[in-house]
Amino acid sequence: MSPSDDPISSIFFERQQAALCAQHALNMLLQDSLFTYENLRDLARQMDQMEHDILGNNANAVGRSENMNDSGFFSIQVIEKALETFDLKLINMENPAMAEFKANPLTARAYVLNLREHWFVLRKFGNQWFELNSVKNGPKLLTDTYVKEYLHQFAAENYSIFVVQGILPNSEADDFITLCPVVPKPTDFDKKEPNLVQKFFNSVGRRLGGSQEIPDSQEDRDLAIAMALSMESKESSESSGSDEDQLAKAIEMSLSQDPNIPSTSAAPSELTETPILGPSTSSETPSGRIPSAEQQRRDRAKFLEKLEEEKKSQNVPEE
C-alpha cells in the first residue's frame, strides 16, 4: 500500500453475515481473517462438553448449547477462549480493576462491546480511534471526545463493555495510520457542522464579548457542536421562556463544564443580564433589538425611579 492510498483502507474489515458478529469482531480486533464459524463452533462445543462434565446431571440437556445458537451467535466465554491463543483477556469495564480505564477510556487500546447479542469493536490505530462494526459499511473514525461520549452512552444503555488486556498483534493498519493519520471525510452531518459551530461561538461571542471565530481544535469543535445541538433541543422542546433566556442557560452550563471556553470573571447571573455593548452608547444592539433580560432590568429600574420620584413629590412641603 502506498502513501497515496486512503489510510483507512488499510484497516481489515468484515461485513456482517448471518449473525456471525462475534467472528467478525474477533477478526477485526486482531486485524486478520483468523477465525471461521467452524472454529468458533468447535470451541463452543468443547466448552459445552466441559460444562456438562463438571455439572453432570445439572447441565443442560445434550444438544442445547449455552455458548452458541443456530444463527451464529457466540457467547463471551467462546470469545475469551479464542483470544487466549493470543494472550489477550477481556475484562468487564465495571470490574473495580478497570477503574483506570473507566476514568480515562483513551488509555486502553481496544474495547469489545455487546448489546442484545451483537458484538463489535472500538480499536485504536496509531493515535486514532475507530469503530469496527460489521453491520456498518466500513471503519468509522472517532475523535477522542466521541470515544468518551460513546462509552458513556453505551454504559447508560446497558451495553456490556470489555477492556482488551494484553498486546494486540501489530498490523499494517497500525503502521500506516501511525505515519499517515486518517483525514475525516465530509458527511451529511459535516455539512451542518459549520452552522452549528458558528451558531454556538456567535452566541458566546455576542453574550460574553469574546471571539466569534470558529476554533481550530477538533476537541473544541466537538464541544461546540454538542452545545449547539443542546441549544437547538432546548429551543424545540421548551415553549416557555425567550430564546435569549434559553441561550443564556446553555452558555452558563457550558462555562461550568469546560474551562477552555472563553469566560469573564462575572457571576453567572451577571452574564445573563449584562448586555455586551460596542463603542456606541445606544441602548440597542446593532440589529435594533434589545435583549429581553436587559429590557426587563431596565424596565425595573425605570419603575423604581418613577416610584422614587412620586415619593419625593409627595414629601415636598406646600408653600
Swiss-Prot record:
Pfam families xref list: Josephin, UIM
One GO term (biological process): negative regulation of TORC1 signaling
Domain of life from the UniProt record: Eukaryota
Assigned EC number: 3.4.19.12
Chief localisation class: cytoplasm
Catalytic activity of the protein: Thiol-dependent hydrolysis of ester, thioester, amide, peptide and isopeptide bonds formed by the C-terminal Gly of ubiquitin (a 76-residue protein attached to proteins as an intracellular targeting signal)
Annotated compartments: Cytoplasm; Nucleus; Nucleus, Nucleolus
Domain UIM per the UniProt entry, residue ranges: 218-237, 242-261
UniProt region (Disordered), positions on chain: 253-319
Coiled coil regions, renumbered to chain: none
Compositional bias of kind Polar residues: 254-267
Biased composition (Basic and acidic residues): 295-313
Keyword Transcription carried by entry: yes
UniProt domain Josephin: residue ranges: 8-179
Keywords: Cytoplasm, Hydrolase, Nucleus, Protease, Repeat, Thiol protease, Transcription, Transcription regulation, Ubl conjugation pathway
GO cellular component: cytoplasm; nucleolus; nucleus; synapse
Active-site residues per Swiss-Prot or TrEMBL entry: 21, 118, 133
GO molecular function: cysteine-type deubiquitinase activity
Residue ranges, annotated region (Interaction with cdc-48.1 and cdc-48.2): 297-300
Subunit details: Forms a complex composed of deubiquitinating enzyme atx-3, adapter ubxn-5 and cdc-48.1. Forms a complex composed of deubiquitinating enzyme atx-3, E4 ubiquitin-protein ligase ufd-2 and cdc-48.1. Interacts (via RRDR motif) with cdc-48.1 (via N-terminus) and cdc-48.2 (via N-terminus); the interaction with cdc-48.1 is not required for atx-3 enzymatic activity. Interacts (via C-terminus) with ubxn-5. May interact with ned-8.
Summary of the function given for this chain in its UniProt record: Acts as a chain editing deubiquitinating enzyme that binds and cleaves 'Lys-48'-linked polyubiquitin chains, with a preference for chains containing four or more ubiquitin molecules thereby modulating protein degradation by the ubiquitin-proteasome pathway. Probably by regulating the IGF-1-insulin-like pathway, regulates lifespan. Regulates germline DNA double-strand-break repair and apoptosis in response to DNA damage by recruiting E4 ubiquitin-protein ligase ufd-2 to DNA repair foci. Interacts with key regulators of transcription and represses transcription.
Protein name: Ataxin-3 homolog
UniProt gene name: atx-3
